[in-house]
From Swiss-Prot:
Phylogenetic classification of the source organism: Eukaryota, Viridiplantae, Streptophyta, Embryophyta, Tracheophyta
Pathway annotation: Cofactor biosynthesis; nicotinate biosynthesis; nicotinate from nicotinamide: step 1/1
MF (Gene Ontology): nicotinamidase activity
Function, as annotated: Catalyzes the deamidation of nicotinamide, an early step in the NAD(+) salvage pathway. Prevents the accumulation of intracellular nicotinamide, a known inhibitor of poly(ADP-ribose) polymerases (PARP enzymes).
Record protein name field: Nicotinamidase 1
Enzymatic reactions: nicotinamide + H2O = nicotinate + NH4(+)
Amino acid sequence: MANHETIFDQLKKQIPVDEEEPLILNRDSSVGLVIVDVVNGFCTIGSGNMAPTKHNEQISKMVEESAKLAREFCDRKWPVLAFIDSHHPDIPERPYPPHCIIGTEESELVPALKWLESEDCATLRRKDCINGFVGSMESDGSNVFVDWVKEKQIKVIVVVGICTDICVFDFVATALSARNHGVLSPVEDVVVYSRGCATFDLPLHVAKDIKGAQAHPQELMHHVGLYMAKGRGAQVVSKISFET
């Protein structure tokens, strides 16, 4: 019998992402939700250089799960922080092509999350770099994200968004380092909700025809992003439930 196991299947066996038990949240959880870059420029078909060119199931599911989770949090008046990728046209973010330029529709929340703009529980933070922690820094040395954590007394941070292996991972890794360094009190845990994350797809055969592009197979890089986040100390879960 032929062996139809793919290289990806073999990789998952070598670097498995052993997910934690389902995360159960209640009014005593002291939890905050961080949504990373769920904007048109990464999620809405045809909305720029980094957006999908056709329906993408992983990205669509991520948007759906992120919106659902945000609604659950806001209904309970729990804090939500949404990072919004926003770049100046004269400051490129290499190696990526121009994307999410300030003042364009690319740099706006997707329609499914646009309602967050009028929610009292939501803090929106535009950032001009991959790492939301760094993008939260102000010229006076303060940090919007750190201040949000301290003001809301957040012990558990739940993270969703795009891209799993880039902006999500960079933020998670830095938040964990800050926690370990004692500058993110009272945070105890950072939880990555796998079904609420996604990354972009650039297969090798397509990347070969784009000067300077690196191949970025979606399923593989999503898995690697989750694996790396767990290796840094994050909890990775595929199910979140709420106690009444």
